[in-house]
Amino acid sequence: ERLADFLNENLQIKILCLYNLDFIPNLEKINIPIILSTNIKDLNVNGFEELELDYFDFEEFISVSKKNLPINNLVGLFLQSGRSKFGEKNILLRQSFTLLELEILKYLALNLGQQISISKIFIELKKRLKTSKDSVYQAIKKLENTYVIYTLKHDEKKLQKIYFKDFGLRNNLCISKDFSHLFENLVLSELFKFKEEFFYNKYFNFYSQISKIAYISSPTLDIDLIKLRAKKILPKALELGIFHVIFITLSSEDNFFEQGVKFEVISFDKFSLGF
């Protein structure tokens, strides 16, 4: 009511913008256009058109960075800095997360791309701080609901992997090098553009049950080894009805067919900038 009164007293205000909402305000008496923003996934307001803005992708990073560098250097810089401000300063981590959330994120950073269970995380965390399994569960759900992490489900078993929405956050949480899984997270971040749910199994890093396309992160695998791997995963691709398998690499490129399945080998920069 106070907001409505304020707007009635200040008729020069033509648009109301409310940022970083964590609750739904009373907007019934407001008669001007309204823009609301939130980082909470399940905060929905009836009568509003919804637009989801993700962290920037590689193409946007190139535009924002304005650095005249070779494309491979830009990929390396993107891997290092990440997709948002979280990749810039450690102080933002302390300001944005509770101690429990930080400990969970540190564990996820150390185990990026690995199969993870809440029980496993809880057993590890209770060695360092006083907490409960329910608290860990709620904290993980909050991190997922605020676009910090992304849970990738196995296509058949009750297994999951957890990645970062901004892979640059991993670099601020963990000093150990894990280029293979960081590149995997990088590939996944580009797939977010499709607004589809992805799954994994032991054959494919990510695949869509809707588009029937599978993706395999292979940053340093050479073409001969990729072709050997393609032969091994071919039966599973045919079983799942997948007729397009994409290997994302740092620089290798090729195309070939096996029993009607297209295997495409493409560098990350062309994969990302080709959307």
Feature annotation, model-predicted:
Residues 1, 11, 154, 159-275:
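A cross-kingdom feature that marks ATP-driven nucleic-acid transaction machinery
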Residues 27, 133, 226-230:
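Conserved strand-to-helix beginnings and helix N-cap segments that scaffold or border functional pockets
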Residues 7-8, 141, 237-238:
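Structural motif
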Residues 30-33, 37-115, 119:
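Interdomain motor-coupling "hinge/lid" segment immediately C-terminal to the ATP-binding subdomain
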